[in-house]
């Protein structure tokens, strides 16, 4: 157990020394992940006034908060999560599992006939510390997010998702290329260097999968 204790202490020390953690606390953002998204949104100019943005696995709300901040009062931000999330001004939150038809029906009722312009997913499993367990779980969540975008994202729309580099990630990116005109892999500055995470961005959703 001592090694785990040292590891936990090291993580806590790094966490509280992290400039993005300090920035999030100072600016009232719910998570440091908001700054990963901020860089990606600006770099690829993903947001336009009046867009409809869906944030999958949104809790604690850092990404939804960043999108609302970036778009001002225009457009709609719809956040979904199986975990509860305290209310955010200008964000519509749906609490539930989007794999369930009842939750999807609620989502569709919320949107009405309004098309979705951008689907975001920063979902990740609770880590066990074993790649053989964590990577398949991560890829399963990624598959679910891609299926959601297949169904709900409008033609020409964009899909941004967090992936862990490892078994299955290359195949997943190939699947994205069948669905989107342009696929780019990003590693934002706020992403910890030792983390296996990258962000895959699909732009220009095809009408039909190639």
From Swiss-Prot:
Keyword Methyltransferase, does the record have it? yes
Q: What class of enzyme is it?
A: transferase
Active-site residue list:
162
Q: Which reaction does it catalyse?
A: uridine(2552) in 23S rRNA + S-adenosyl-L-methionine = 2'-O-methyluridine(2552) in 23S rRNA + S-adenosyl-L-homocysteine + H(+)
Q: Which GO terms describe its molecular function?
A: rRNA (uridine-2'-O-)-methyltransferase activity
Q: Which InterPro entries match?
A: RNA_methyltr_RlmE, RNA_MeTrfase_FtsJ_dom, rRNA-MeTfrase_E, SAM-dependent_MTases_sf
Entry EC number(s) = 2.1.1.166
List the GO terms this entry assigns under cellular component, sorted alphabetically.
cytoplasm
Residues given in the record as S-adenosyl-L-methionine binding sites: 61, 63, 81, 97, 122
Q: Which UniProt keywords apply?
A: Cytoplasm, Methyltransferase, rRNA processing, S-adenosyl-L-methionine, Transferase
Indicate yes or no for the key word Cytoplasm.
yes
Q: Which Pfam families match?
A: FtsJ (PF01728)
Query: Where does the record place it?
Result: Cytoplasm
**Family from the record:** Belongs to the class I-like SAM-binding methyltransferase superfamily. RNA methyltransferase RlmE family.
Q: Any idea what job this protein has?
A: Specifically methylates the uridine in position 2552 of 23S rRNA at the 2'-O position of the ribose in the fully assembled 50S ribosomal subunit.
Q: What is this protein called?
A: Ribosomal RNA large subunit methyltransferase E
Its lineage opens with: Bacteria, Pseudomonadati, Pseudomonadota, Gammaproteobacteria, Lysobacterales
Name of the coding gene: rlmE
């Amino acid at each position: 157990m001592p090694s785990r204790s040292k590891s936990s202490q090291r993580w806590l020390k790094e966490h509280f020394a992290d400039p993005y953690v300090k920035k999030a606390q100072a600016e009232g953002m719910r998570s440091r992940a908001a700054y990963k998204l901020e860089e990606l949104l600006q770099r690829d100019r993903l947001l336009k006034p009046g867009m409809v943005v869906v944030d999958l696995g949104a809790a604690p709300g850092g990404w939804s908060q960043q999108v609302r901040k970036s778009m001002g009062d225009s457009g709609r931000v719809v956040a979904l999560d199986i975990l509860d999330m305290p209310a955010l001004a200008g964000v519509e939150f749906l609490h539930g599992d989007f794999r369930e038809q009842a939750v999807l029906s609620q989502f569709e009722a919320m949107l009405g006939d309004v098309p979705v312009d951008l689907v975001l997913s920063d979902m990740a499993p609770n880590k066990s510390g074993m790649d053989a367990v964590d990577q398949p779980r991560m890829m399963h969540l990624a598959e679910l997010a891609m299926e959601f975008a297949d169904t709900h994202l409008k033609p020409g729309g964009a899909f941004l998702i967090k992936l862990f580099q490892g078994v299955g990630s290359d195949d997943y990116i190939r699947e994205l290329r069948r669905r989107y005109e342009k696929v780019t892999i990003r590693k934002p500055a706020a992403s910890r260097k030792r983390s296996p995470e990258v962000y895959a961005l699909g732009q220009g959703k095809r009408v039909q999968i190639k």
